[in-house]
A protein has these predicted regions:
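N-terminal periplasmic accessory domains that precede
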Residues: 1, 5, 19-22, 34, ...
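Short acidic/polar hinge/loop motifs at secondary-structure boundaries
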Residues: 9-36
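Outer-membrane beta-barrel signature, preferentially recognizing the C-terminal barrel domain
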Residues: 70, 75, 179, 183-201, ...
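Transmembrane beta-strands of outer-membrane beta-barrel pores
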Residues: 71-77, 90, 101-105, 146-148, ...
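Transmembrane beta-barrel wall of Gram-negative outer-membrane proteins
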Residues: 77-103, 116-165, 194-207, 259-267, ...
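Flexible loop and strand-edge segments within Gram-negative outer membrane beta-barrel domains
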Residues: 129-135, 149-207, 211, 217-251, ...
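Signature of Gram-negative outer-membrane beta-barrel scaffolds
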Residues: 268-379, 402-404
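Gram-negative outer-membrane beta-barrel transporters
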Residues: 309, 442-446, 450, 455-545
């Protein structure tokens, strides 16, 4: 529900895997802006929770040749990495190239065992075996700006390869997690991904009008490899790439056109259109997500009124339309296995389809109204209210298989409707002589909210545990974030911050699954010129508000030095 933009284009990978992270070069980030309220209407229904806008470093104002080298090390997994950048600014042109690489070993964790499918698996030396990896990134950015015209062009490629902990992949087997004496090797099972992105911005400005267009192509190719294993004896070894368990090849075309009209010094309007087309192809001897293609388009209007430096009011509306076509997928080997297990033909017919063909169309509107009030330099108040909706993802409609990154069998529901809800948030900031306080409460009500829920139903797939199914329900969210910041003795800063989220399933009068616990951070920082040292105590509370068939989680304390 949060869109991530890089150079004006939404990042599109396999978002069904929250364990995947973002295929972005962390060294190549100039500024990060967080957008909430009406401004998020510019980016589509999947930005209902806000937008993280990542932009490249600013262009130098004078002609020059420049570069930098950055080195990185981490003790938690023995990371060794670095990045090299070279850039040139000449007249109307600016160009930059960057290469980054990281190598890391097995992750250290503060436990000697984990539980996988009710079995305790040892963690030798408190290192997760085979979780080492490598990352290689290269990117090129160029910009031309002259008078009223501006254009930029970007090409990037991100490659990652990471091992899977073998104790939570496939059939439980303690012998697979025995220490092999090498904490930096990558053996089967592992995952690898390559993300190619090509984007361009074209912009022309008149006195009171700015016309801009963002266009992009992305290819996200993710694969998961594991020594061929079958839970059904009749499944033969594939002739080609026998150890390729899962593969997803996602192609995305994106385009957006926006017109910004500056009516006066206090009034500004924006009109826009955007569209996106995706196609996802699959391969491998296992199944998690079917092939599909998806198209979305939207129209938007946004306006901002700022009569003075004290108050600013903004509002906007957006209409989105989407279409998704999901292909069916039959598992004949599962059907044979179930027959041998004594299932009747009606049950076999039900379970043998990993996914059924689905054709769905969605259309709905969103709107938002926001206020910023700054009565003085010390005080600032913000408030937003709006209606939002989101199209269901392909995984929410049709996933059906074991997701090894999170150790669970995830299943979609083709009957899900679009997500719809009302959201309201506010914030208050006070700054006074080295002291600041910030409080940000929020509340959201969804008439239909889609979430992954533990069902308590045992999967017919062997060694898969219970099924986690995407479900729609009426839901209430409420919570707050708060921060107190104190600057003292010239070089010291103390910050205490906390966050709390309350979730409630109105249909069944219980909490939502995977509700985050209350957490707090106490951070003491010393800084002088370019040198900064800090110590932090992070407290995570116990979570007793859980869904049915979900375990309670104990609290934890983490201590950080940096």
């Amino acid at each position: 529900r949060i869109a991530v933009l890089e150079n004006g284009i939404k990042q599109e990978g396999q978002q069904w895997g929250a364990d995947h992270g973002l295929e972005l070069d962390a060294f190549n980030i100039g500024t990060v802006n967080v957008l909430k309220g009406p401004s998020s209407l510019l980016y589509g229904s999947d930005a209902m929770g806000g937008v993280i806008d990542i932009t490249s470093p600013p262009v130098p104002s004078v002609d020059m040749l420049f570069g930098d080298v950055t080195l990185l090390g981490k003790s938690v997994n023995g990371t060794l990495g670095g990045s090299f950048m070279l850039g040139i600014k000449k007249s109307f042109w600016y160009a930059q190239v960057r290469y980054s690489e990281q190598h890391f070993g097995d992750y250290r964790i503060p436990t000697d065992t984990i539980v996988y499918l009710t079995q305790k698996m040892p963690v030798y030396g408190r290192k997760l075996k085979n979780t080492a990896g490598i990352e290689r990134n290269i990117g090129f950015f160029a910009q031309y700006q002259r008078q009223r015209y501006k254009a930029n062009y970007s090409v990037s490629n991100v490659y990652q390869k990471t091992g899977f902990f073998p104790g939570a992949h496939g059939i439980p087997d303690a012998s697979r997690v025995e220490d092999d004496g090498d904490s930096r090797n990558m053996e089967l099972p592992y995952s690898k991904v390559n993300h190619l992105k090509v984007t361009t911005l074209q912009q022309y400005a008149w006195e009171k009008l700015v016309l801009s267009g963002d266009f992009g192509f992305q290819n996200n190719h993710r694969e998961e490899w594991s020594v061929f294993h079958t839970h059904y004896g009749s499944q033969p070894v594939p002739e080609k790439d026998p150890d390729k368990e899962l593969a997803f090849n996602l192609n995305t075309l994106s385009a957006s056109v926006k017109v910004r009209f500056i009516g006066s010094s206090s009034w500004e309007h924006a009109l826009g259109w955007d569209g996106q087309h995706q196609r996802n192809d699959i391969s491998g001897y296992s199944f998690l997500l079917p092939e599909y293609y998806r198209s979305t388009t939207g129209l938007l209007w946004l306006t901002t009124y700022k009569p003075n430096n004290v108050i600013s009011v903004s509002g906007g509306m957006r209409y989105d339309y989407g279409y998704i076509h999901i292909s069916s997928h039959e598992d004949a080997y599962l059907a044979d296995y179930l027959r041998k297990q004594g299932y009747d033909e009606e049950q076999v017919e039900h379970y043998k389809w990993n996914s059924h063909a689905v054709k769905k169309k969605f259309g709905d509107y969103s709107f938002s109204l926001g206020l910023v009030w700054t009565p003085s330099e010390r005080h600032m108040v913000k408030a937003n209210v709006g209606r939002s909706f989101r199209l269901p993802g392909a995984n929410e409609l049709a996933a059906n298989g074991v997701h090894h990154g999170t150790f669970r069998h995830e299943q979609g529901d083709a009957n899900l409707k679009s997500e719809q809800g009302w959201q309201m948030d506010a914030s208050y900031n006070l700054r006074y002589n080295g002291f600041s306080i910030s409080v940000s409460p929020f509340v959201s009500w969804f008439s239909n909210y889609i979430f992954l829920r533990p069902t308590g139903e045992w999967s017919v797939l062997p060694h898969a545990g219970q099924i986690y199914r995407y479900t729609g329900a009426e839901v209430l969210f409420a919570g707050t974030e708060a921060t107190i910041d104190i600057h003292f003795l010239r070089s010291f800063n103390y910050r205490i911050s906390g966050e709390y989220v309350y979730t409630y399933n109105c249909d069944e009068h219980i909490p939502l699954s995977f509700s985050p616990p209350f957490s707090m951070r106490n951070t003491l920082t010393w800084q002088r010129k370019q040198v900064m040292l800090y110590a932090e105590w992070q407290s995570i509370a116990r979570q007793n508000r859980v869904d049915r068939n979900e375990d309670r989680t104990p609290g934890a304390n983490l201590f950080h030095l940096g």
